[in-house]
Swiss-Prot record:
Gene that this sequence comes from: NST1
Cytoplasm as UniProt keyword: yes
Signal peptide (from-to): none
PANTHER family from the UniProt entry: LD36051P, STRESS RESPONSE PROTEIN NST1-RELATED
Compositionally biased tracts (Basic and acidic residues): 158-167, 579-710, 954-967
UniProt feature coiled coil, ranges: 557-704
Organism: Phaeosphaeria nodorum (strain SN15 / ATCC MYA-4574 / FGSC 10173) (Glume blotch fungus)
Functional summary from the UniProt entry: May act as a negative regulator of salt tolerance.
Protein name per UniProt: Stress response protein NST1
Assigned protein family: Belongs to the NST1 family.
First-listed, main subcellular location of the protein, grouped into a coarse class: cytoplasm
Length: 1202
C-alpha cells in the first residue's frame, strides 16, 4: 500500500533509496571534486562522481550525471523529492545509476553514495566498511523504476559492470581517523554477491511528477542557514582547502524567492568537505595530549567524550536512553494533541508509541554492543555508520548514526551550548498540512554537496520525525489496504475514513506528470520485464529503523554531550575549588612566611635593642661612676673650702676682735686725751676770763681816769696827753701778761719772718682793695686819720659791727671781682652726670640729689651749709668737732661718703677754702700801714702776734726784744692752737693759681658719675651718690683734695687743688683701699682685676698667669702709703673662697712652688652669663635702674669695669 496518495504506485517500503540516502546523509567525508572511479573510492562510505550526461529531452548542461556511474540517470518521482515549499510548476528529477537523486541544476555538486551496508542493528552498531564488490546491490542501493526505458537499461548495465569490477578489483581497507584499519570491521549478515531481483514498479503515470532541480537546492531558507553559520571552522575560520566553489547560475527563470540569490555562493557548510588524502592523526598524540580541563583542543575533546561514554555504567546509559525516549514521546503527544481524533489516527498514535519503544530498545542494544566492542578492541569504529571521518574533521556538526562517543568539533559545542535539553531542539511551528509529511523526501535532496536529513528533521522541531514515525506506523495499515486492493482492484486506495483534507499538491503533480508523459512511458514499457526487483517487508522495516536511528543518534548525541558537559562542569568546578584552595593555601603559606620573616626581623630588632640597651646601661654606669667620682671630688673640695672658710672666719673673727680691742683702746685714749684737753681748755678759759675781767677793769679805770684827766685838762696840748696814753697802755700790758708779770714792758714789733695780712672789714663791693702802708709810715700818721676809721673805742673782745667773713675766698686771693657763682649751695646737677660747670662758674657743694634712691640731708639739718665763721675766728672747729652732724661722715662699707659731706680723709669743699693764717684784724691804726703793699701770697701758719698798743702810742724802742721773749712765746700759744698737738697740725701747701687754661690736659677725664665708667676716679669702690672727683665737661680742673663727695657738677676754676693731669697712667680709684676696708679684701679685689686684665695677653693654655707678673701689677696699683704685698698675703688672699661683689667675685686658683711661693694664678668667673636684653618696649627690670643706683654699674652691659 502506498502511503503517498492514490497516484502513488509504490509504498514507503518500495522506496529504499530514501532510507539509504538518509543514512548517507550522516557521512561527513564529502568532496565535490573527487572524480575517481568507484573502485578507488570504496574506502569511504560514499564516492563522489562527476555529473552524468543529461537525459534525453533536456540540454546536456542541465542534466546531472556521474562520470563513474555506468547507468544513465533515472527520473525519481517528485513525491519523494518534494521541497518544503510547494510550487505549482512541474519539476523533474533524475537519479543516477547509483541511485543518487540528481537534478538538472547544480550538477557539479552531486553525490553518489555507493557501498552502503545493510541497515541491520549489527551493521549500524558496528559500522562496517567493505569494498563495493563485496556488497550486493540490493544491500545498499535498490534499483528504482525508471521513467525512461533507456535509462533503466543503462542503469542495469552499469550496475552489473560495477559489481563485476568491484569483485575483480577490491579496494584496500579504509584507514580510520585514529589509524585503525577497516580490516576489523564486520560485514553485515545479509551481505551477498548475488544480484537481487529487480523490483516491480507500477505504471509511471501513477508516479509523482518530476520537478525541476532549481527547487532541489533550496530546501533551506536563509533563516535555517543561520543555524549553521557558526560551526564551520575553529575560531570562525575555514579549514584550508575549503574554499567556496563557484556555482553556475541557473539558465531558467527562478520560480521561488530563494532562487533569486542563486548567483551568490552557497552557505559555508556546502563547500566544507574533507580533502581526498587527509592524513589521519595519530592516536598516541591524542592520548598524550594535555590533561588540562580548562583549555582543550577538538581532538582532546572528542577523546574525552569517548572516554566518558565508555566510563558510564549500564544503568547510566539506560537512564540516558530512557530520558530520550520519554522526551520524544512527550513531544509527540504534544504535537498530536490537537490532531485528528478518528480511529485511524488513534491506531496510528498507538502504533507510533509501540514502534518508538521497539526502536529505542533496539537502539539501546546497539549502543551496548558498541560500548562492549569499544572496550574490547580499544579503538574507534569505522566512520561508515557513524558519519565521522576522522581524517578531516568537518567544521559543521552533522547527524550521525552512532551514539555520542564520537568526537565533536568546537563548533558543535557552540551550536548546542544553549540547548540544555531536548525541548531546546524542538521549535514550535504552525502545524503542517495534511500532505506535509510527504515533504520529508525533500530532506534527501543534495544541497551544496551535503545531504542534510537529520538537520532538516531537527530544524522543524521534530515535526518531520513525528511524520516519519506516523509513516512507520501506517505500514501495517498499508499492508492491509494493499491486500484489499489486490483483492478488489476497483477500490480506491485513498483512505476515505480520514477526515484529513486532500493534498493540494496533487493537481500540481498532474500537470507536471503530463508534461513528461511523452518520453517516460516508453522507458517504463521497455523495462517492465526488469522490474522484478522488489523490496521485502523486512527491508522496509530496516529502512524505517535506519531513519529513526539517524534521528535518535543525533538526539542522543546531545544527551551524552550534555551529560559530558555537566561532568566537565562539575570537574571544572571541583578543579576550581581545588585551585582556589591551593591558592588560599599558597596565600596562607606566603602569609605564614611573611609572618615568620617579620617575627625574625622583630627578634633581630629586639636583639639589637637589647644590645643597645646593654651598651647604654654600660655607658650610664660608667657615666654614673664618673659622676660619682666627680661628686666625691666636689664634695671633698667643698669640704676643704668649708674648712678654709671656717679657718678664715675664725681668723677674721680674731682679727675683728683685735681690731675692736685696738679701736676701743684708742677710743679710750682719745677720750682720755680729750677730757684732759677739755680740762685744760676750761682752765685756760677761766684764766682768760679772769684776765679779761681784770683788763677790762683796768681799762675802765684808765678810761675813767683819762676822761677825768681830759676833763680837767681840756685845754691841754697833745704833748701832755701822750705820756698818759703810754702809761695806760703800759699798765694794760702789765695786766695781760699770762705769767702773772705785772711789770710793764715795751711792746715789740711782729716777727718779720711771718708777715701777716690784715683782714678786710669792709664789703667787697665798697672796698675792693684795702690799701696797705709800709711800716715806716705808721709813725707819721695822725690820730685824726685813725679816728676816722674807728669812731668808737674797741677792746680786744669786741666784734666790729660791720665785720664780714671772708671765708669764701682764701687769703692771698686778689680782691678783683670774682667770676659768677655756680648753682645755689646744696643743689647739685642731674644725678649720675658729672656735667661740671662752664669755665668761670663757681660751684657750691650741696647735700646731694633729692631724687628717689638717693641720700638727702637728714631731718634737722640745714638745706644749705652754714656760713663759715668770721675771719677773726678760726675757720675750722677744734679737733674732734668736725661739725653739727649726728651720723658718721663715712657711708656704709664699700660706699663713699654722703653727698655734701666730706670723708675723714678728704678736704672740705672748695667753697670753704683752706684755713687762713692765724692772725687778727688790725684795728685800723697806723700799725696797719706798716706793711708795704705787695702781691698777695700764701704764708705759712705762725704764731699770732701779741696784743699791743696802737702804733701811735707804741714807743719806738727796739732794743727790748730779748727781754720780752718769754711773753712772745706764751702769746704764740694762746687760743685754740694751744690745744693742738704738734702732729695734728696739717701741712697745707701753698695755693697755686686756680685760673686754668680751658681744655688743659691737666684736668681729669670727664666722668659720668658711674663707679665703673672708664677712667672714672672715685674715692670708693662703689659710690651710689655719684662720682666725687670728676672733671667738668667744660674743661675746668677737678678738685681731688678739697672737692665734695657729691659734686657732680665738677669743680670751679677758683676752688680746689690740681690733681695729676696724667690720669691715664694713674691707678683706678676703685683699686685703692677704701677706708675701713680690710687689707685682704682689697688685695683680693686687686688680684682679680689684675688677672682679668692679664688673662687676654699673658695667660697660658690653661688660663694661668705668672705670679710674678701679677705681683708687679699689684705694686703698680698699690698706694705708696700701703706696705708691699708679700707672698704670704698673696696666697692668703687667693685662699678666700667666698667671692663676693666687694672682694672681686669668682674664685682664684694658684700653683705652688716647692718653697711655698706661688708660681701661677688663675681667676675663674663663677657668675652666670649676662642677662639677655628684652624686646623693644619691654625692658628687663634689671636694666630699668642700676642695682647700685645711678652711681652703680650697669649689669650685663659690657666687660668688667665698665
Amino acid at each position: 500500500m502506498d502511503w503517498t496518495g492514490a497516484r502513488a504506485r509504490t509504498s514507503w517500503g518500495k522506496r529504499p533509496q530514501t532510507a539509504a540516502l538518509g543514512l548517507a546523509a550522516t557521512f561527513r567525508h564529502l568532496n565535490t571534486d573527487d572524480h575517481r572511479p568507484i573502485e578507488q573510492t570504496t574506502q569511504t562510505p560514499y564516492s563522489l562522481h562527476r555529473p552524468l550526461p543529461p537525459p534525453s529531452g533536456e540540454p546536456a548542461t542541465d542534466t546531472p550525471t556521474h562520470s563513474s556511474c555506468p547507468a544513465p540517470p533515472i527520473a525519481v518521482p517528485s513525491s519523494l523529492l518534494l521541497p518544503r515549499t510547494t510550487h505549482p510548476s512541474s519539476r523533474s528529477s533524475h537519479i543516477c545509476a547509483c541511485h543518487t537523486p540528481v537534478t538538472a541544476r547544480h550538477s557539479p555538486n552531486r553525490l553518489c553514495p555507493v557501498s552502503l551496508p545493510t541497515p541491520t542493528p549489527r551493521s549500524m552498531a558496528q559500522g562496517t566498511k567493505a569494498p563495493a564488490a563485496a556488497m550486493p546491490p540490493n544491500s545498499s542501493v535498490l534499483n528504482m523504476p525508471a521513467l525512461n526505458a533507456v535509462n533503466r537499461k543503462k542503469q542495469k548495465r552499469r550496475e552489473k559492470e560495477a559489481a563485476k569490477k568491484a569483485a575483480q578489483d577490491p579496494s584496500p581497507p579504509a584507514t580510520l581517523r585514529n589509524g585503525v584499519s577497516s580490516g576489523s570491521t564486520h560485514l553485515p549478515a545479509n551481505a551477498a554477491h548475488t544480484r537481487q531481483p529487480a523490483p516491480h514498479y507500477d505504471d509511471p503515470e501513477l508516479d509523482d511528477p518530476q520537478y525541476d532541480d532549481e527547487d532541489d537546492a533550496d530546501f533551506y531558507s536563509d533563516e535555517e542557514a543561520e543555524h549553521y553559520e557558526h560551526a564551520y571552522g575553529t575560531n570562525g575560520h575555514y579549514q584550508q582547502g575549503y574554499a567556496h566553489a563557484p556555482i553556475p547560475s541557473s539558465s531558467k527563470k527562478p520560480r521561488k524567492k530563494k532562487k533569486g540569490a542563486a548567483a551568490h555562493p552557497p552557505h559555508a557548510y556546502t563547500q566544507h568537505v574533507a580533502p581526498r588524502h587527509s592524513p589521519a592523526p595519530n592516536h598516541s598524540m591524542v592520548t598524550s595530549g594535555s590533561k588540562s580541563i580548562w583549555n582543550t583542543s577538538t581532538v582532546e575533546e572528542r577523546e574525552r567524550i569517548r572516554e566518558f561514554w565508555l566510563s558510564l555504567g549500564e544503568d547510566e546509559r539506560k537512564s540516558l536512553v530512557k530520558i530520550e525516549k520519554e522526551a520524544v514521546l512527550r513531544k509527540m503527544k504534544e504535537q498530536q494533541k490537537h490532531s485528528c481524533s478518528c480511529s485511524v489516527c488513534g491506531r496510528k498514535r498507538t502504533a507510533i508509541e509501540e514502534e518508538l519503544e521497539v526502536l529505542y530498545d533496539a537502539y539501546y542494544e546497539e549502543l551496548e554492543q558498541y560500548a562492549h566492542l569499544q572496550q574490547d578492541v580499544g579503538r574507534f569504529l569505522p566512520d561508515a555508520n557513524f558519519g565521522h571521518v576522522r581524517s578531516a574533521p568537518h567544521p559543521r556538526p552533522l547527524m550521525t548514526t552512532h551514539p555520542p562517543p564520537g568526537p565533536y568539533d568546537d563548533e558543535e559545542e557552540d551550536e548546542y551550548s544553549g540547548e540544555d535539553d531536548e525541548e531546546d531542539i524542538f521549535k514550535y511551528l504552525p502545524p503542517p498540512d495534511a500532505a506535509d509529511f510527504l515533504r520529508f523526501g525533500s530532506s534527501l535532496t543534495v544541497k551544496g554537496g551535503i545531504l542534510t536529513v537529520a538537520d532538516d528533521l531537527l530544524k522543524n522541531d521534530g515535526k518531520k520525525f513525528i511524520e516519519m514515525m506516523e509513516q512507520l506506523a501506517e505500514r501495517r495499515m498499508q499492508r492491509e489496504e494493499e491486500a484489499n486492493f489486490h483483492a478488489h482492484p476497483s477500490m480506491h486506495r485513498y483512505n476515505s475514513a480520514h477526515n484529513h483534507a486532500p493534498q493540494p499538491e496533487e493537481e500540481e503533480y498532474d500537470d507536471e506528470v503530463d508534461e513528461e508523459e511523452g518520453f517516460e512511458d516508453e522507458d517504463y514499457e521497455e523495462d517492465d520485464e526488469d522490474e522484478d526487483e522488489a523490496m521485502t517487508e523486512e527491508q522496509r522495516m530496516e529502512e524505517g529503523r535506519r531513519m529513526f536511528q539517524i534521528f535518535a543518534a543525533r538526539m542522543f548525541e546531545q544527551r551524552v554531550l550534555q551529560a559530558y558537559r555537566e561532568k566537565v562542569a562539575a570537574e571544572r568546578q571541583k578543579r576550581l575549588l581545588e585551585e582556589l584552595e591551593e591558592e588560599n593555601e599558597k596565600k596562607d603559606q606566603k602569609e605564614a612566611k611573611k609572618a615568620k620573616e617579620a617575627q625574625k626581623r622583630k627578634e633581630k630588632k629586639e636583639k639589637q635593642r637589647q644590645i643597645k640597651a646593654e651598651e647604654k646601661a654600660k655607658k650610664d654606669a660608667e657615666l654614673a661612676a664618673k659622676e660619682a667620682e666627680l661628686k666625691a671630688a666636689e664634695e671633698k673640695r667643698l669640704e676643704e673650702q668649708r674648712k678654709k672658710r671656717e679657718e678664715q672666719r675664725k681668723k677674721k673673727e680674731a682679727e675683728r676682735k683685735a681690731q675692736e680691742e685696738e679701736k676701743q683702746r684708742k677710743e679710750a685714749e682719745r677720750q682720755k686725751r680729750l677730757q684732759e684737753e677739755r680740762d685744760r681748755q676750761q682752765e685756760l678759759e677761766r684764766k682768760a676770763r679772769e684776765q679779761k675781767a681784770l683788763e677790762k677793769k683796768v681799762k675802765d679805770d684808765a678810761k675813767r681816769k683819762e676822761r677825768d684827766r681830759a676833763g680837767s685838762q681840756g685845754e691841754g696840748g697833745s704833748g701832755r696827753r701822750r705820756p698818759t696814753t703810754t702809761a695806760s697802755a703800759r699798765s694794760v700790758k702789765v695786766c695781760r701778761s699770762p705769767h702773772g708779770i705785772l711789770s710793764s714792758f715795751v711792746p715789740k714789733a711782729p716777727t718779720p719772718s711771718r708777715p701777716r695780712q690784715t683782714s678786710r672789714q669792709g664789703s667787697h663791693g665798697s672796698s675792693p682793695k684795702t690799701p696797705q702802708v709800709a711800716p715806716g709810715t705808721s709813725k707819721s700818721m695822725s690820730p685824726t686819720s685813725q679816728a676816722q676809721g674807728n669812731m668808737m673805742p674797741k677792746s680786744i673782745l669786741t666784734k666790729p659791727a660791720n665785720s664780714q667773713h671772708a671765708g669764701h675766698h682764701p687769703l692771698g686771693q686778689p680782691s678783683s671781682p670774682m667770676p659768677p657763682i655756680g648753682p645755689p649751695p646744696g643743689l647739685s646737677g642731674p644725678p649720675g652726670l658729672s656735667m661740671g660747670l662752664p669755665p668761670g662758674l663757681n660751684g657750691f657743694p650741696g647735700p646731694g640729689s633729692m631724687l628717689p634712691n638717693m641720700m638727702s640731708p637728714r631731718p634737722g639739718m640745714p638745706f644749705f651749709p652754714q656760713p663759715p665763721v668770721p675771719q677773726a675766728f678760726r675757720g675750722f672747729p677744734p679737733p674732734g668737732m668736725a661739725g653739727p652732724r649726728g651720723f658718721p661722715m663715712d657711708g656704709p662699707p664699700g660706699l663713699g661718703p654722703m653727698p655734701g659731706f666730706a670723708g675723714p680723709n678728704q678736704a672740705p669743699p672748695f667753697g670753704m677754702g683752706p684755713p687762713t693764717q692765724h692772725s687778727r684784724q688790725g684795728s685800723g691804726s697806723f700799725a696797719s700801714m706798716d706793711v708795704p703793699i705787695s702781691a698777695p701770697s700764701v704764708q705759712p701758719i705762725h704764731r699770732p702776734a701779741p696784743i699791743q698798743r696802737p702804733s701811735s702810742v707804741k714807743p719806738h724802742d727796739s732794743n727790748k726784744h730779748g727781754q720780752d721773749s718769754d711773753v712772745d712765746e706764751l702769746a704764740d700759744h694762746l687760743g685754740s692752737k694751744a690745744l693742738l698737738d704738734e702732729e695734728d697740725v696739717p701741712e697745707i701747701p701753698d695755693r697755686r693759681s686756680s685760673v686754668q687754661q680751658h681744655g688743659s690736659m691737666r684736668s681729669m677725664p670727664i666722668g659720668f658719675g658711674f663707679p665703673d665708667a672708664p677712667n672714672s676716679h672715685q674715692s670708693t669702690a662703689f659710690n651710689g651718690f655719684g662720682s666725687a672727683n670728676t672733671a667738668s665737661i667744660w674743661g675746668t680742673p677737678p678738685s681731688q683734695a678739697f672737692s665734695s663727695a657729691a659734686g657732680p657738677w665738677g669743680n670751679s676754676p677758683t676752688s680746689g687743688f690740681f690733681t695729676n693731669p696724667l690720669t691715664m697712667s694713674s691707678p683706678r680709684v676703685s683699686d685703692h683701699r677704701a677706708p675701713n676696708e680690710p687689707r685682704l679684701v682689697w688685695l683680693r679685689r686687686v688680684i682679680c682685676t689684675v688677672c682679668k686684665m692679664l688673662s687676654s695677653r699673658h695667660a697660658g693654655p690653661d688660663g694661668f698667669i705668672d705670679a710674678n707678673e701679677v705681683q708687679q701689677q699689684l705694686d703698680a696699683f698699690r698706694d705708696p702709703r700701703e706696705p708691699v704685698v708679700t707672698q704670704e698675703e698673696l696666697k692668703e688672699a687667693c685662699d678666700i673662697i667666698d667671692g663676693t661683689h666687694n672682694n672681686g667675685g669668682g674664685s682664684l686658683e694658684y700653683k705652688n712652688l716647692g718653697d711655698g711661693r706661688l708660681s701661677h694664678i688663675k681667676f675663674v668667673d663663677t657668675t652666670g652669663p649676662p642677662p639677655a636684653l628684652g624686646e623693644i618696649g619691654s625692658p628687663i627690670p634689671s636694666h630699668s635702674l642700676p642695682v647700685a643706683g645711678f652711681g652703680g654699674r650697669f649689669p650685663g652691659l659690657g666687660p668688667q669695669g665698665f
